[in-house]
Amino acid sequence: MEKQTYSYEEAYEESLRYFQGDELAARVWVNKYAVKDSFGNIYEKSPKDMHWRIANEVARIEAKYSNPLSAEELFDLLDHFKYIVPQGSPMTGIGNNYQVASLSNCFVIGVDGEADSYGAIFKIDEEQVQLMKRRGGVGHDLSHIRPKGSPVKNSALTSTGLVPFMERYSNSTREVAQDGRRGALMLSVSIKHPDSEAFIDAKMTEGKVTGANVSVKLDDAFMTAAITGTPYIQQYPVNAAEPTVQKEINATNLWKKIVHNAWKSAEPGVLFWDTILKESVPDCYADLGYRTVSTNPCGEIPLCPYDSCRLLAINLYSYVANPFKPDAYFDFELFQKHIALAQRIMDDIIDLELEKIERIMEKIDADPESEDVKHTERILWDKIYKKSGQGRRTGVGITAEGDMLAALGLRYGTEEATEFSEKVHKTVALSAYRSSVEMAKERGAFEIYDTEREKNNPFINRLREADPQLYEDMKKYGRRNIACLTIAPTGTTSLMTQTTSGIEPVFLPVYKRRRKVNPNDTNVHIDFVDDTGDAFEEYIVFHPKFITWMETQGYDPTKRYTQDEIDALVERSPYYKATSNDVDWLMKVKMQGRIQKWVDHSISVTINLPNDVDEDLVNRLYVEAWKSGCKGCTVYRDGSRSGVLISAKNDKKEEMPPCKPPTVVETRPTILDADIVRFQNNKEKWVAFVGLLDGHPYEIFTGLQDDDEGIILPKNVTSGHIIKKVDKDGSKRYDFQFQNKRGYKVTIEGLSEKFNKEYWNYAKLISGVLRYRMPIEQVIKLVGSLQLDSESINTWKNGVERALKKYITDGTEAKGKKCPNCGNETLVYQEGCLICTTCGASRCG
């Protein structure tokens, strides 16, 4: 029986109803989480379908164990993102048989033992790419690479150091498409490595290492030396008792460089490595393969090589009874029950992940390539499979901390609010670990559990002190999971829960958006006209839970308020002085440190700072983070990623050469390279052929893809050539040629004859402006402005826009467009997606 499919418009409209008119939440869900096949067919109409998909799959695993949860019970926990929210890959992948992909959000890779050869470096590069193509973020450490100038036994004679390999790994990341997005990569290095200063400076040159986040691993000895002004010894290998390279450095100067670069460009992040290792429960098993070496791309999961983690968030706001009212309270009884169930669901998801990895390995085995070609990928997944099953690591976290506090009448960043947050996270830790012990009774402990190994771990001893009976039960029965907790960023997740993100405060309770309007419509109010003459109406957008506050106070959220009235409303609300730019930054760092004591992995937090803060504040924040027991810290100074980053070796800005008009090639070459882009036009499968000249779009053809009158094209074909042919009678035609799997050339003749004439004429118009090198973003704007009557033509138009977006130069400003999340005009194109440089929100498609 063929499964029902939906058009984008059908799924969007149904999701819009589901999210009660929240356009951004609806688009995020359809674009990122609705199940689709490789042709773009959509198989889910709203998040309700998705939640049943997840509930049914988890219930299937539950049935293997005693006291199973039913699909109905699970659905009630998931429905409307109210209580338990699987994040990212689990939300997309559970029960999704249209992709052969992992359910893990993140991985760390590495090489055991000596790993400073080209072979080891390139092996990690291949492993990184293989994981990213399966939708995983990847982290790895570079401390194993020999410092620059070290002798090597090859034709180079001396090592190039680690910076060139940073660029290599970064480029590999950018090459890998994950559902239209680039991969996510974390590169780390120990401050003890002699090349760590070059690592810290690597991203200060414009355009370098743009495909990776970078973090430096700081030990306590370095932090002490930096603060006291004493020397610090770097060495290689970094952990060797008898290093081959040693040098003494001024720790204070290197610390100042870290602070300056973070102030200037938001990187590097800092990882307080001794704190991470000392607090890590998995590192009690370091000699059994669980030695932590790096973190995932956002920094919330420190991992050993070939381990992975899946993420889930608890919506804290939903446990506030009578929110924003004088009698509001937090329902700890329901909360404890749901944390236990969340830990159980996460353990079920490990079983689902093991099934997914088995399917990946079956596909690798069945692929026609030789065993030599497949060897690295096959061994990689085998290692991940074993590590996932052995440790059964989970990542139970939270979201909506800011809204929870506001709903209880507590102001984020105050001592009272921080004290309450600490109580909540202590409850999470005790409930999750108690659940893991209960599962050990029913399902068995993770196979290498050993109470004796963990007896001196500070985190385990905190649990022991808070709940002695829990510790005694853990000694008796073991624990199901080697580690359980994290706090991850919940960007798109929080858009769908319609709450604040992670443990962050609200970004803004009120902001403005613009929508394009017809200037001749007497029912609209024109607030802004851009430089092309398009008219826009501005409208106020309230943070969803700010609307709830307004309604409890008797204010009408549909009324058109003046700016003074809005300011007065915010001042009366619990969100006043509690936004990301308002909170006391040092208090926020201390709050992170206090919560970290109840999180066995780590916490991903960004401290948002206004543009005018000085470097000394960044210095004080980083030092306070170390002293407070944070495992890592990242700052973002408003606007610090825009503009030109100057190389550390040259503070003088180069003068830009005079602008030259783009080269126009009026006579079309006989053969052009071409990319294939598939899209939906209503319920029909269409294909676009984008002809390229020197990598730039030169022409576009589109047509129906079917077996009768349309185009027959294997789904694995993504590129080829468009060939212009002139027949003896002078008539012209365009053919498409590609190479099939067996290496033979296949030609599809007469593209123009296969297209509807109306579409053909519009495509000729678009090709004309492409040929004369109109900037791609302006071509897309032109296509979007076409006023067409036919619904089919309009959906075709959307497909053409999506096909062309991938060719916009990264970093191009989206002029005249505001971020729908924070309201700032700071959107840039990145890999065909719109990225906000202020708040980090993204939108693809």
Question: Where is each model-derived feature located?
Answer:
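Short, Gly/Pro- and small/polar-rich lid/capping loops
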Residues: 471-473, 647-692
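Internal maturation/activation junctions in enzymes
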Residues: 74-75, 236-238, 338-385, 389, ...
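Short, cysteine/histidine-rich loop/knuckle motifs that typically chelate Zn2+
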Residues: 820-824, 838
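Conserved, charged catalytic cores of large soluble enzymes
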Residues: 2-68, 72, 154-168, 178-290, ...
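Catalytic alpha/beta core of large soluble enzyme barrels
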Residues: 23, 299-301, 353-354, 460, ...
